[in-house]
């Protein structure tokens, strides 16, 4: 069973949507739509959402705007979300552990946005701590049959001249599906499927951020017949 993203292209890219029972990692630079994506999955699907907001990125006003723009009851939408706001890595660990008793069959989604915010602040010695938290999240996904979205940030790797996900190997071991978000041009973002359990890697989908949240970018065919974004 999957949860729709509300974006046809992303659902197809992910093999039907965000899967229950596994962890989806979504990473990319600032302002590429990662938080909006996570909020939208929670908004558009049945069930409660446990949302661990480590960076203060969750906005009730933004969620209400998304709901109203889609003709949904904003207060009802907001009531689905249970928000946790850890201030450091230790509190984050306690909250994630607490989710084992908080998450019931009424929940469909767990979000950690972002998992690595406090990890970055406290240094690279916290690999083991992150691995333990991911182990709990993996248990939640499997035992509670929920989808788990882990948002991750990036750093600049001077050796490869590229942006790489923070704690790449630690997260990569536990996250079965990985989406990378990028800025394509003004008003347009792209999602790249870096890893999936059964879908081919490297697929790309373009999307835009609007009052509704995120939406498909329609391809327009110019006179030469070639498709451009």
UniProtKB/Swiss-Prot annotation:
InterPro entries reported for this sequence: AAA+_ATPase, DNA_recomb/repair_Rad51_C, DNA_repair_and_recomb_RadB, P-loop_NTPase, RecA_ATP-bd
Protein's UniProt keywords contain DNA-binding: yes
Signal peptide: none
Presence of the UniProt keyword DNA-binding in the record: yes
Superkingdom as given in the UniProt entry: Archaea
Annotated Gene3D superfamilies: P-loop containing nucleotide triphosphate hydrolases
Pfam families: Rad51
A Gene Ontology molecular function term of the record: ATP binding
Gene Ontology terms: biological process: DNA recombination; DNA repair
Keywords: ATP-binding, DNA damage, DNA recombination, DNA-binding, Nucleotide-binding
SMART domains assigned to the protein according to its UniProt record, in alphabetical order: AAA
Protein residues bound to ATP: 28-35
Family, as annotated: Belongs to the eukaryotic RecA-like protein family. RadB subfamily.
Function: Involved in DNA repair and in homologous recombination. May regulate the cleavage reactions of the branch-structured DNA. Has a very weak ATPase activity that is not stimulated by DNA. Binds DNA but does not promote DNA strands exchange.
Name of this protein: DNA repair and recombination protein RadB
Organism annotation: Pyrococcus abyssi (strain GE5 / Orsay)
